[in-house]
Amino acid sequence: MDITIIAVGNKMPDWVNEGFSDYATRFNAEINMQLKEIPLQKRGDDKQIAAARSKESAQILAALAGKDYVVTLDIAGKNYRSEQLAARLQFWQENARSLALIIGGPEGLSAEVKNRAQESWSLGALTLPHPLVRIIVAEALYRAWSINHHHPYHRA
């Protein structure tokens, strides 16, 4: 299965890229995880913010393949314990060829992007820095995969 994390923001610090890469490369051949970055648009007043989010949304939608099963990362989404996420990952692997997980910009995701998604996943009620979310998502998916494969990484 191909898993693509589409994230608004580029020019991340090295520790973000290294953290993401560390988890993304731990899967065996059955999962290929990659990252597509959408450039963060310049922000200023409310009008510029709306235009920036609109442009980012168009780029997110353009980055999706028609066959992608789309999951947005959103505070209003479903929370999962690690074991529940493992079951969800199993479902995605059985029912989708490719999975796209979308991390929005500072103002979140547009209605158009949310409407394209089949699901929405919340990492919890905390506000998290978007660069860190990339690493958290990669780690959570690796942990879910580890649970499904009885790998010692996850010790409940």
Swiss-Prot record:
Coiled coil ranges: none
Binding positions for S-adenosyl-L-methionine per the UniProt entry: L73, G104, L123, G124, A125, L126, T127, L128
Record's GO cellular component terms: cytoplasm
EC number: 2.1.1.177
HAMAP family: 23SrRNA_methyltr_H
Family matches, as Pfam families: SPOUT_MTase
NCBIfam families: PRK00103.1-4, tRNA_RlmH_YbeA
Protein name from the UniProt record: Ribosomal RNA large subunit methyltransferase H
Cystine pairs: none
This protein's UniProt keywords: Cytoplasm, Methyltransferase, rRNA processing, S-adenosyl-L-methionine, Transferase
Class of this enzyme: transferase
Single GO MF annotation: rRNA (pseudouridine-N3-)-methyltransferase activity
Family, as annotated: Belongs to the RNA methyltransferase RlmH family.
Domain of life: Bacteria
Stored InterPro entries: Alpha/beta_knot_MTases, RlmH-like, tRNA_m1G_MTases_N
Chief subcellular location: cytoplasm
Main function: Specifically methylates the pseudouridine at position 1915 (m3Psi1915) in 23S rRNA.
CDD domains linked to this entry: RlmH-like
Oligomeric and partner information: Homodimer.
Lineage: Bacteria, Pseudomonadati, Pseudomonadota, Gammaproteobacteria, Cardiobacteriales
Subcellular location: Cytoplasm
Species in which this protein is naturally found: Dichelobacter nodosus (strain VCS1703A)
Catalytic reactions on record: pseudouridine(1915) in 23S rRNA + S-adenosyl-L-methionine = N(3)-methylpseudouridine(1915) in 23S rRNA + S-adenosyl-L-homocysteine + H(+)
